[in-house]
Design a protein with these regions (language model features):
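Alpha/beta enzyme core
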Residues: 2-288
Length: 288
């Protein structure tokens, strides 16, 4: 599909004209898993800005406007302080910058746990403000009824089990889950409960590989791993992590590039040229 996409290469910072490529839908994603198998794994990355979305869109099946933006964009210590307004602002930008991927937006901590009605109000707000296709919420069996409530009212839901960052204060850190029998059973049961509720996909995060594989085989919905297993039905990473924007990243991250070093070298060159007055040159100035 990506071969028909023409990446906008204009110098304008304005949004490019939409390309002749049909946007994927939630049913497309759900249908990728047939009889318990996904022939081509789903590709998902996080996106927080329109330009980032433009660059990622043709390579991905899904773009996740993750509440990880709290740490990545705002420098917050965790995802807990992220607000609905933050998510709405970034979600709208990502939708404007994409034409192919299914855009999923995280429901931030405190926006859906109190009641199913609260969850619906928050999810409806996010979808109306952004144009995103679906919301993602953390939690398994405890959130299954909420997921079903949203689905019955026209809001597609992606689930999230295993290590759930919004519960970091309860979990006591970011250690991998599923090492004990009790944890392993809970992860599988959580995934099954969400699947029965009708979610179209389930993120499995920070889970020991055998349990991630077991959970994937136990559900009809595609699973998307992050620190889980290559045998999940897809994968997701925080884009800035895989690009090498940060010195410290979780063990499960593969750095495909060292963009931080590229930026450092580039800015150092710019600063040097400004200080020695070699920038701007005649090529960058207007003459009479």
């Amino acid at each position: 599909m990506s071969s028909t996409f023409q990446l906008d290469t204009s110098t304008s910072r304005a949004n490019p004209t939409p390309q002749p490529m049909k946007r994927l839908t939630v049913p497309h994603i759900r249908a990728r898993k047939v009889n318990g198998e996904t022939k081509e794994p789903l590709v998902m990355l996080t996106a927080y800005t329109a330009r980032q979305a433009q660059l990622l869109d043709r390579h991905c099946d899904l773009l996740l406007v993750g509440d990880s933006l709290g740490q990545v964009i705002y420098g917050l210590p965790s995802t807990v302080p992220v607000t609905l307004e933050m998510m709405a602002n970034h979600g709208a930008a990502v939708v404007r910058g994409s034409y192919h991927s299914v855009v999923v937006i995280d429901m931030p901590f405190g926006s859906y746990e109190a009641s199913r009605e609260q969850a619906f109000e928050s999810a409806a707000f996010l979808l109306k403000q952004t144009g995103a296709a679906a919301v993602k919420l953390e939690g398994g069996e405890a959130m299954a009824e909420t997921a079903a409530f949203l689905l019955a009212r026209g809001i597609p839901v992606m689930g999230h089990v295993g290590l759930t960052p919004q519960a970091v204060n309860t979990l006591g850190g970011y250690a991998a889950r599923g090492r004990s029998d009790a944890e392993a059973d809970k992860i599988v049961n959580d995934a099954v409960a969400l699947d029965k509720a009708g979610v179209f996909a389930i993120v499995i995060e920070g889970v020991v590989e055998p349990i991630a594989i077991k959970a994937t085989g136990a559900v009809g919905a595609p699973t998307i791993g992050i620190g889980a297993s290559a045998k999940c039905d897809g994968q997701v990473l925080v884009t800035e992590d895989m690009l090498g924007m940060f010195e410290r990243v979780p063990r499960f991250v593969k750095r495909y590039e060292d963009i931080a070093s590229v930026i450092d070298r580039t800015v150092a060159t710019y600063a040097e040229e400004v200080r020695d007055r070699s920038f701007p040159s005649e090529d960058q100035t207007y003459q009479p």
